[in-house]
Amino acid sequence: MLTLALPGRSALVLIADGDRTPITATGGGMRIAALPETVRGDTLSVAGTAAPGQTLQLVLDGDLAQASAVTADAGGQWQTTLSTDALMDAAIAHRVVLWDPVAAVASEARTFRAEKTWREVLRIDDPVGDDHGRSGRIRYPQDPGWGDNHQGDIERITVYQAGSALKIDVRLRSITGIWNPANGFDHVALTAFIAMPGKDGGSRIMPLQNAELPEGMQWHYRLRAHGWSNAWFDAKLATAVNEGTPLSPGAGLHVDADQRTISFLLSAEALGNPESMSGAKLYLNTWDYDAGYRKLSPEGGNMVFGGGNSTDAKVLDESAVLIFP
């Protein structure tokens, strides 16, 4: 068993020398009590044992920078509450250990999965066949990969909440994987803008799309996703030619091709840990992306949208501005 703390963005190469050494137990008296297999909600109560008065670090998924300090009482018992709000994917098994930075040893790991309890807060059905841009004249590129697929035609947007975390489901007329995209969909890019309640600042500019947000909306967070990227931005530094300030963590992404639905998962941490999402606004549009939002020209082409000038809005289909109850 190897236990080693490494600085962020570092790596270690090990070469076996051929010698064998028996594995011995590590961690001394450090123990974490059994955890539930599945955690629902935004917190997890964690308890265990250590030497009386000993201060250790409780580490989730190997992230020492965000470790919580725990100190055992006179009886060698400790207890703390671990935030699970940022854990969005129920398929992932999360790992918790106690770490002794003095002795550089870790306890036996405990694992659990985190499952959100989502409630629907918004749903809007979008007209079929309105994927022709703000002018009504935009045409898909002529390559048959688009053809009758209409990957940019939004049919429904459904928003769910769990605390201040969000799940945004976008159902399209079709989802294709013709180009073997890493994210499970191609021939379309989705761009979403979120305005936070009670937050100053923001921007009306839709970076790189030659347009502004409708209805006077000003965004604080922006999501841009296509088959090979999934990026999350703050409005700081955003201009017509600058997407804003990249942020982490970003959105989780899941594609259900059978249901023609792309889902985005945003933790409360990604949204700045707001006390409430009541009054927040969401706007979403489609286009496509190829080293930038795909080109537009009056005549169009195999890989170029047609029906507009290069300076026209790069918006194929779009939602209204949706306001959270």
List PLM regions with ranges.
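Carbohydrate-interacting/catalytic domains
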Residues: 1-32
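Exposed aromatic-hydrophobic patches
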Residues: 2-4, 77-85, 263-269
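Ser/Thr-rich low-complexity repeats and stalk/linker segments
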Residues: 26-114
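Solvent-exposed serine/threonine-rich low-complexity stretches and specific carbohydrate-binding patches
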Residues: 63-76, 81-83, 205-219, 247-254
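Glycine-centered loop-to-beta-strand initiation motif
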Residues: 72-80, 168, 258-264
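Short glycine/proline/serine/threonine-rich loop/turn segments at secondary-structure transition edges
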Residues: 87-93, 179, 272-278
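Acidic/polar low-complexity flexible segments
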Residues: 113-127, 195-216, 270-325
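Surface-exposed, glycine/proline- and aromatic-rich loop segments on solvent-exposed faces
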Residues: 119-124, 128, 138-229, 289-294
